[in-house]
């Protein structure tokens, strides 16, 4: 998996559009204030009406797992103590793209207006003999959705759930039927497209 350097695009609004700012100086000053886990690499102007959340066309998340104890991965990847069938899990990922309603993967008790999302990509990738990541792209995500999807895919990969069962979970739209929500430490926002 990648190191702790993940690109992310926060957006800030200025009170004055007249004022020009030296972006290199601003980036340096922000880096002096930010926690060591966060870094600003560049600052670019955007349209005044752009909204960081609502103007996004798609988002891509990655969830990292590893199967051998590794002190360099433990903070940002989930260590699994069992073998998974990643081919079968990728088949389940393709099934995800056939659906638009993901109520089964929404955090219980969420007060969302809709559970509709358009998933355009869902696949596991192997980066070494013992490390993998799941990448998923959609126009939007529900709260806890990616972690619940990964937990359900792990059930498929362990042979505890068939592909037909996986379809029934999605179609049933009940969070209690899906797999467990995996720990947040291994989930990263990889990209936002505008």
Provide a role label for each language-model segment.
Residues 12-194:
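Structured-RNA-binding interfaces characteristic of tRNA pseudouridine synthases
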Residues 1-10:
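Single conserved hydrophobic/aromatic residue that forms the stacking wall/gate
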